[in-house]
Amino acid sequence: MGITLTEPELYLGEDVTGIATFHFAQGVACAWTGRAPDKESDNEDALGLIPCGSNAGVLVVADGLGGLPSGKQASSIAVRQVSRNIVASCNEHPVFREAILDGIEQANQRVMATGTGGGTTIAMVEIVNRTIRPYHVGDSEILVTGQRGRIKHQTISHSPVGYAIEAGRLEAGDAIHDEERHLVSNIIGATDMRVEIGPRITLAPLDTLVIGSDGLFDNLHAGEIKEI
């Protein structure tokens, strides 16, 4: 099932019909993006699968903010820019950290230079020989689960709700109903943008990696996501 990617596969503000499936970095990657069922405006999300040989690559999701066209433009800028940097850094022994961080910083400068007031979140995972490392800005999240559904890693959303959960002041199950769940504290497109880098994690054969925007994580509990 699926094809083997040899060059970047990018989805920039478009709705994907069905789930796109690819052989990617010694595993199988499934991609889908679409606007919310009750939303009349265009899809502001973007995603990319950027391979580097058969054993490595980077997965990225960006969620545009600020309303159309600026949100859609911002997420597309971010995914295109990091994709360019990753492709340029790809070699027999890839080291993605510098390319990812430089790509995010360059995307931040380019989004601010548009002058539209738009911004975007971003969540990225580098994969090299079944070892991953997460990077994120904003409230798009990264989740790693084990064979029996145990949560092995979950990023902290850069938002009032995310910080409240981490501090123990809000139960994760109550976050979906919190009135501040749509607020985000850190974005590409701001002078104070910062990138959070997670730990290196070696994936077991049946581990699952999920990268999604708040459209996923604001509507389903982590426990529900891992069941899917």
Model region roles, listed by residue range:
Residues 1-228:
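PP2C/PPM-type serine/threonine phosphatase catalytic domain
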